[in-house]
């Protein structure tokens, strides 16, 4: 299954950003899904990871499930590298000739792969 999370972000202080993103299934982190993003201006990001649902051996840290027959909770979380690189997520900083911040709705796509 392909998990894709698309979102807008911009530097909180107007300079640049560094952020770290991770995903977990039922509270266990998929360490192979760790990612970092950075930008200097409004940027549209794509955080994505493919979960293998028919693995011979289950290893959530590697994104491998032996099967998927019950409900599962997938969490995507993020943090700034430090307060010097804060990121305002789900927003634009610049719009129509001004620097007013506007909300931008994120998108989540779950695609079954065969």
Give the location of each predicted region.
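Extracellular jelly-roll beta-sandwich "head" domains, especially the C-terminal globular C1q domain
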Residues: 1-114
């Amino acid at each position: 299954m392909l998990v894709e999370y698309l979102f807008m972000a911009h530097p909180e202080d107007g300079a640049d950003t560094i952020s770290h993103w991770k995903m977990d299934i039922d509270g266990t982190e998929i360490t192979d899904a760790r990612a970092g993003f950075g930008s200097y201006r409004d940027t549209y990001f794509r955080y994505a990871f493919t979960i293998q649902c028919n693995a011979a051996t289950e290893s959530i840290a590697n994104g491998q499930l032996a099967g998927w027959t019950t409900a599962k909770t997938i969490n995507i979380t993020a943090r700034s590298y430090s307060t010097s690189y804060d990121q305002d997520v789900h927003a634009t900083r610049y719009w129509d000739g001004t620097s007013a911040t506007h909300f931008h709705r994120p998108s989540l796509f779950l695609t079954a792969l065969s």
